[in-house]
Amino acid sequence: MKNLDIFDRVRGGLIVSCQALEKEPLHSSFIMSRMAVAAEMSGAVGIRANTVADITEIRKMVRLPMIGIIKQIYKDSDVYITPTMVEVDALVETGVEIIAMDATNRLRTGGKSLDDIFHEVRNKYPDQLFMADCSCYEEALHAEEIGFDCVGTTMAGYTPYTQGTSLPDLAFIQKISQAVDVPVIAEGGIHY
C-alpha cells in the first residue's frame, strides 16, 4: 500500500538536494550525508539524493524522507534521471520513499517512450511512490494521467523546448498546481 502520508510530512517545507556528480569537488557519499545532516539541522523536511551509495549513507545519518534518483547517461538518449528499470530496481532496493523519474516527452534509451517505461515500472512496483520530473505543463498533466504520484518542475529549462526559461518559473508552478490533483513539488532554479 502506498504511503501517501509522506506528502503531508513535506508539504510547505524545503526538500534539499544533496547531490554531487563524479567530477564535482564535493563528490562523496560521506560529504553528501553530512550535507543532509546540515539540511536536517536547518529545518529541511526532505532530501533529494542521487545514487544508491549516497542514499544509503544519508539514510544512516538522517531520518528525513528521501526522493531518490540515479543519473545515468545512455548514448542513445538525452534522458538521464532514472531512465530505465535498471535504475528503478536499484532505488527500490534502498527503501527510498519516492523515486523521481524524468517525465519529459523525450525518448528513453532503446527508443522507449515515458508511457512504455512507466507502465512497466508501475506494474512491477504498484506501491512505490513516483515523482515525475517535468519540463512543461503538458508533461505534468500527462504524468498525472499515467499514474505518477506527484509532479515536479525539475526539468523546466533543461529540455530543448524549454531552454531559456527564466528560473524559477513561478507561472509554471502555479499553472500546474491549479491543474493537477497530485502534489506538486516546485524544483529547479530555486535559490532562495
Task: Name each model-derived stretch.
Residues C18-L21, M41, I70-Y74, T94-R108, ...:
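Glycine-rich phosphate-binding active-site loops on the catalytic face of alpha/beta enzymes
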Residues M35-R48, T94-G95:
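Catalytic domains of carbohydrate-active enzymes, especially glycoside hydrolases
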Residues A39, I58, L91, A143, ...:
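Conserved, mostly hydrophobic/aromatic
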Residues G43, V62-M66, T94-I98, K124-D127, ...:
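Glycine-enriched alpha-helix->loop->beta-strand junction motifs that scaffold or abut catalytic
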Residues I15, G46-R48, I67, I99-D102, ...:
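Conserved beta-strand positions in the central sheet of alpha/beta enzyme cores
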Residues M1-L26:
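N-terminal amphipathic alpha-helix/helix-capping segment at the start of soluble metabolic enzymes
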Residues P25-S29, R48-I67, D78-M85, A103-V121, ...:
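Active-site-adjacent beta->alpha loops and helix N-cap segments on the catalytic face
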Residues R11-V16, V62-D76, I117, R122-A132, ...:
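Short beta-strand/loop segments at the ligand-binding rim of alpha/beta enzyme cores
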